[in-house]
Design a protein with these regions (language model features):
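N-terminal targeting signals for export/organelle localization
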Residues: 1-52, 56, 209-210
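Short loop/turn microsegments at loop-to-beta-strand junctions
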Residues: 50-51, 73, 172-174
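Short active-site neighborhood of thiol/selenol oxidoreductases, capturing the structured segment around
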Residues: 63-93, 109
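Soluble periplasmic/extracytoplasmic beta-strand elements of cell-envelope proteins
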Residues: 76, 109-112, 174-177
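Structural microenvironment flanking redox-active thiols in thiol-disulfide oxidoreductases
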Residues: 90-150
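Sec/Tat-exported extracytoplasmic proteins
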Residues: 97-101, 130, 151-154, 158, ...
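Thiol-/selenol-based redox modules, centered on thioredoxin-like
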Residues: 161-210
Length: 210
């Protein structure tokens, strides 16, 4: 009876070590951090992910979470008439596009925070001015509150109307790096070329994750 008890303890210990080892192995595969609240479910870690969405791009096409399924993408927020940080951010996204021009697994989603003005036609002209590649760089519009909610609750950044600012809108300067599972893997200052260069490096690193 004593021997049986010892054997049972050994088996339980072995299983516990195996589960711990699997968890360690999974975490070691993550070459970049995961942003957002983490919830533990038994032995699994459940990370914050981008939820479902449906917006319209500069060609009048519907873009949803299915568009970016199993793809890495960079997300940001802007508006077409912005004369402060947006031109610099868009210019830097041109560099990101250029670095992965022939890579269909990398997309860019730029969300307007002024959908009332930024119609499909306006976004199309804006996209042309930055030589955005169709199917790779989507400029998105939709319901204002939906976009603001998406920014705050999914991408964890600011996007809102603000009468206290010269241009009437307040939005984050961050570029968000999203992995194939919809998790936020990096946040970068889109106005800083050094940070944008790091983003490009991190995208290449993220592509090596299994």
């Amino acid at each position: 009876m004593l021997m049986k008890s010892k054997r049972n303890k050994v088996v339980v210990l072995f299983i516990a070590l195996a589960l711990f080892s699997c968890k360690q192995s999974e975490e070691q595969k993550l070459l970049l951090p995961v942003f957002g609240v983490k919830h533990l479910s038994n032995t699994d870690t459940i990370y914050h992910t981008i939820g479902k969405f449906a917006l319209t791009n500069q060609f009048g096409e519907t873009v949803t979470e299915q568009t970016v399924k199993n793809k890495i993408y960079v997300a940001d927020f802007f508006f077409a008439t912005c004369q402060s940080i947006c031109p610099q951010m868009s210019k830097h996204l041109v560099e990101v596009q250029k670095a992965f021009e022939k890579d269909d697994s990398l997309l860019i989603l730029s969300h307007t925070v002024n959908p009332l003005h930024d119609t499909i036609e306006v976004l199309n002209q804006y996209a042309l001015s930055y030589k955005a590649i169709k199917g790779k760089w989507h400029f998105l519009t939709g319901n204002k509150l939906t976009i603001y909610d998406l920014a705050k609750n999914d991408y964890l950044v600011n996007a809102l109307e603000d009468d206290g600012t010269p241009e009437g809108f307040l939005h984050s300067e961050l570029f968000l790096l999203i992995d194939t599972k919809g998790r936020i893997r990096g946040m970068y200052d889109g106005t800083d070329l050094v940070q944008v260069t790091k983003l490009i490096t991190d995208i290449k690193l993220l592509k090596k994750e299994k």
